[in-house]
């Protein structure tokens, strides 16, 4: 898994974690936020590494499914980009344009 994908999943987890089961949330947080390996998570939870892998895989698929439907992460990225652009060139016209784009 490349770093960009890892960061994206961590961001999706931040937004959508409340929609996951407690175990999926726990396993995903351990893996993506606490940087634990699958083996470490399996040992801590007295389950097989394969069970952790399957749960994480399903959890990640759910996160992407929620994002495809709700697009909260994309909206967050768009707002951030617009604010960075505004910071670089602040004018009343640019502010109005950005507000219009965000609405």
From Swiss-Prot:
InterPro entries: RNA_pol_sigma_r3/r4-like (IPR013324), UPF0122 (IPR007394), UPF0122_fam_protein (IPR054831), WH-like_DNA-bd_sf (IPR036388). It comes from the Bacteria. Pfam families: UPF0122. Belongs to the UPF0122 family. Might take part in the signal recognition particle (SRP) pathway. This is inferred from the conservation of its genetic proximity to ftsY/ffh. May be a regulatory protein. This is UPF0122 protein FN1394.
